[in-house]
Every structure is written in structure tokens, then in C-alpha cells.
């Protein structure tokens, strides 16, 4: 994987408590938002699937959760994630299905399970 002719290094795995994560607060309920905010170092949301995901790919964010992607939103990110040893799954930790769109997470290995645990705790992942 390359950016501007320079090979990308595998991002360092950052524990969730030390990581900036990206998710859209407008589509998640308060319980989920507070759980993610409390567990992480900070929250930033750019609002572009590609721009939020590239922050994970470059090691600047620990995770990005997208709740309404289209197939073209996930293809390039998936290739980078595969090449760099990142995790990219559905929110129930299943392989992505490129024939349809659906919520996904791209993250480093240290954040993945903990973010999914928060998203799926209680009554499960909730959209307002």
C-alpha cells in the first residue's frame, strides 16, 4: 500500500483508551455515544467515509464506524486494511459482503473487539 509513492507502514495498534475514534453521533443513541466516548481518548468525525477511514489506515485514529456506507465506500478501505493488517468487519464481526452495503468498522487490532463490544452491548447496536 502506497501514498504518493511512499510505502505505508503497518499502523501501530493503539488501545482504545489511547485512541481517537470516528463515528457519527447523529445516528447513535446516547448510551452508545457515551460508551464510546468514555472508553476512548477522544472522538472526531470528519463526515467522509474515505477521509475518516484513511485516518485509521495511517494510524491517526484507532477506529472508524460507518453506519450507512455504499459499496464504493468500503472497497478501497478494505484493500488498505487487508494490506496493512487492520480489521474491517460488519458491526457483528462478520466478513463484509460487497454485494450490499451495511454498517462496518475499520480499526487497528487493539481497538476492534472493544469498540464492537460497546456497539453491541445491552440491547445491541442502536440507531436513533
Please name every model-derived segment.
Residues 9-128:
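An extended, acidic
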Amino acid at each position: 500500500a502506497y501514498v504518493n509513492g511512499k510505502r505505508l507502514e503497518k499502523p501501530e495498534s493503539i488501545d482504545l483508551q489511547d485512541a481517537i475514534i470516528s463515528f457519527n453521533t447523529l445516528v447513535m443513541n446516547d448510551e452508545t455515544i457515551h460508551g464510546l466516548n468514555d472508553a476512548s481518548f477522544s472522538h472526531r468525525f470528519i463526515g467522509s467515509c474515505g477521509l475518516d477511514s484513511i485516518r485509521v489506515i495511517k494510524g491517526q485514529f484507532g477506529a472508524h464506524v460507518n453506519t450507512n456506507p455504499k459499496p464504493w465506500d468500503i472497497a478501497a478501505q478494505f484493500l488498505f486494511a487487508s494490506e496493512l493488517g487492520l480489521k474491517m468487519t460488519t458491526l457483528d464481526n462478520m466478513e463484509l459482503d460487497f454485494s450490499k452495503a451495511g454498517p462496518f468498522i475499520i480499526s487497528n487490532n487493539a481497538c476492534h473487539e472493544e469498540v464492537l463490544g460497546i456497539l453491541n452491548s445491552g440491547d445491541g447496536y442502536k440507531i436513533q
